[in-house]
Amino acid sequence: MDLAQNREHKFVSAVMYLHNDAAYIDMFLSMITQELAALFDKYELIFVNDASSDDGIAKIYDFFEHTKMDSQMVSIIQMSSYQGQEAAMNAGRDLAIGDFVFEFDNLFIDYPKTLIRKIYERTLEGYDVVAAGCRDGMRFTSRMFYSVFNRNSNSEGKIGPETFRILSRRAVNRIKSIGDYIPYRKAIYMNCGLRADVIEYHAIDIDARRKALKGRHERTHLALDSLIYFTDVMEKVSTVISALFVVISLLMGIEIIREFCMKTQAVSGWLSTMGFMSLSFMGVFILLSIIMKYLSVILKLMYRKQRYLIAGVEKIAPKQ
């Protein structure tokens, strides 16, 4: 009775990403159902199956076959093909109807279960986005990416490694108003104009955490796309390269003028050919810098449709 009285009278959603995570499903389901049942009167679980090839979905059905379902709803989104974590989690968030939405990017548990309550209680202090992050075992390339991103991003919110997060309904609505296409959730969440915070923790098992982190090829593409979308790094790089070649062209022009003034014997036609090429390439590189600037502006203004396809949504209903 006391437990029921201590529950929050709110409906929350928990969105979980699935891609060959069968090894972690049983432990995760036991933890998440216990914690959410202790915290809230009603909740829903949304599993986004991103073309898993293992028996993870069967394990989910088996778990709820032997679990009493009196305060939760369970949905499984079947993606039509493998589409990556960002697109899959966008699909799950769009389906969620809770007052608060938890997002779990993977099912591996390397944090104390009390952290779920802790990040929720942080939202009660006025924060609309609260994430749980861990820097233990972070690769050098990840550190470099976050450093470059935060240094070159024009926004105040800084990003870092995150394991899971909670969003208020106001944050979800704000994100939807920003645009239909969310290429990198972490950057959007931390810079949507609402109060955001990160609670850091230390991993229970660093080696196991490193093994559980997957999708390195996908993360590489995501990192490059994010630098293009949210920072001016690529614009700066292209400008530096163009400026370098402009300088080389100018030096070549100076050399041509020097040889002409000193009347140095040269191969017939060499001066005119090199002079034309120097001026031409200098013009090309200047134009490329201007084009890159225009492309950067167009990219920020362009409206993109949501990019994910689902095959269907399955519901796990309680037994009658």
Segments the model singles out, each with a brief description of its role:
Residues 101:
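Short aromatic/hydrophobic "clamp" motif used to bind/position activated sugar donors
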Residues 24-26, 54-63:
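Acidic helix N-cap motif at the loop->helix transition within catalytic regions
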Residues 78-96, 114-118:
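Glycine-rich, basic loop-to-helix element that forms the pyrophosphate-binding segment
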Residues 173-233:
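Catalytic donor/gating beta->alpha subdomain of glycosyltransferases that bind UDP-sugars
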Residues 235-316:
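Membrane-embedded multi-pass helical conduit in multi-pass membrane proteins
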Residues 1-34:
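N-proximal low-complexity "stem/linker" segments adjacent to membrane-targeting elements
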